[in-house]
Amino acid sequence: METCKTLFSKCINTLNNYTSFEDYYDYLKNQDETNTFCEYYLRDKKESYLYKEFFEKVETLAAFFQRELSEFAENSWVGIKLTNHPYYLAVCFALLKNNFNVMLLDNNGSTDYFDYVVKNSKLVAVVTDAPFESNSVKFISFQTAISPKLIPDENIKNKKFANKISLCTSGTTGYFNIVVYSGEQIMYQLKSVLSILKESPAQDMLIDNSVKFLVYPPLHHIFGIIMLLTYSFVGVTNVMCEKTTLSSFINAINEGNVAWAAAVPLIWEALTKFIKGKYKSENAEALRETLGENLKFCICGGAHTSPEVIKLFNKAKIAFSECYGMTEAGMVSLNIGQTEESRMNGSVGNVHTASCAMKILTTDGKILNEGIGELLISGNGIYASTLKNGKEIPIETFENSNFIKTGDLVEIKNGNIYFRDRIKDVIINSSGENVCPGELEKYFAPLLENNVQYTILGINYFPVIIISLSEENFSEGIKELLTQKVVETNKNLPLNKKVVAIYFTTKPFPITSALKVRKFRLKQSIEEQPQNYVKVELINKTVKKFSIEEIKSDLKTFFSTYLNLNMLDLNDGSLIIEELTADSLIMAELFIYIEEKYQINIEQEFILKNSLSIANVANMIFEKA
């Protein structure tokens, strides 16, 4: 074993000579074929994939695609639309080996997303098991392609190894954009990531193929694919999950003895919420008990996470670092502070270790090295072009410089980079002051205790909060409780940051592949479909209180009796299946108990659904009884 700093330095020296995906592929082929490339965690089993099996699959896939795609011209765009899988990268290499450019597609993309992609890339085929509606695209079954019945074809023609991939931005602000990378730019990104990581808190950790890295972000996302390519190059064992659930994440870390993990904020925040629900506190001991003793280093990317998450992990002696990046540039920076305090200062890295040169564009048009404004970046790892109507459009730089505009409002202070918000999300009030919804949202975190989603955006120059909850959880009682929480939080906010209204809805938020709320679409929905939202003005608002404590107490007694639990261990937010571990037999018993005692009719599907808390059931009974 070597230290990360030593091994990463060697990898950087190697990457200095690489300019293509073919270089990368040939390097991987030199790995010990008996080493494990990936462990794959399914619902009830684990599958291991050796390098030998991985490269045999690449050859089989290359022959299969050569037959299936023979009608299309080389250099055409072929998409991969899959959930994370050990053979995701094998599909990518097999397509590149056939001289097809590869587009990484969101497996859960919207109709608008795929319409945009097909129109602007002239996509000819997609490898997937979940086709979207299209008359111009050929769909190739992934399960058929990786079938063990298919064997390598010795008659396969050697073709030029393609050197382009593309990704489509998530449309956070309402607009999609397909960005194209060459292999040279991706190799530079890998080198930059390793250059940052070798100075991180992980620098003295020992590493070899026995060390496991959990790749949890979706691989069509720049954060996910760069993490997979980086750690595959290093030679660790990758770990993936079939399901993108919190339980599968926790299970993979424990069962796989994972040492390193990468995920988006939603996962880390859901984890801390789960721990609080299960252990009734957010402490380092509870986190360690949940994740085991082997986890050492976590990277959070895709969006900004809460300070509470960072603090909890670092207190548990798990180095937790936030990174900043974008589809157009990959991972740009990472907070690599060597102490807990430096990793908890809210920064997402430092300009001196970032992969790109950085400048600040102020609202009055000045370009500064430090200050608050839109971030400008420049570097060799930035995308090469965009796809529009089937043609590649060269990168657009700012005022004929080498810099591009990121659309992100940041502050650079003493070299540290602090992400504030998306420029298009910033609310400029009637006084000309900037209000950042992303920062404001942190104050309303107590709302999450009620199993809801929320976000803040600007309407008519003022901040408003939108709260989404399930139809089963929606009641006058819960609405008034949430309103009271918002009112209490508002009391402690400056006048210009107080939210002026709440919009309640049972509609799920439109989200991106990075699990960010598409605020542009949400605001559009409020304007075009007001019937889907219940507006509560917060000016001179008096809150009516409803009590359902008796019902909650009765339910706690039920679970205490049937599950042999201490009443003190039960609270309103206890998740019945995930935390109290009630099985289908107990849930059926609960169904009968409620109907008989409260003389109400309820849908059985409601009782059997996951993520149902004692409070959810109590609210349902309160509404119907």
Label every PLM stretch briefly.
Residues 239-241, 309-364, 368-373, 381-385, ...:
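Conserved ATP-binding loop and adjacent catalytic segment of the adenylate-forming AMP-binding
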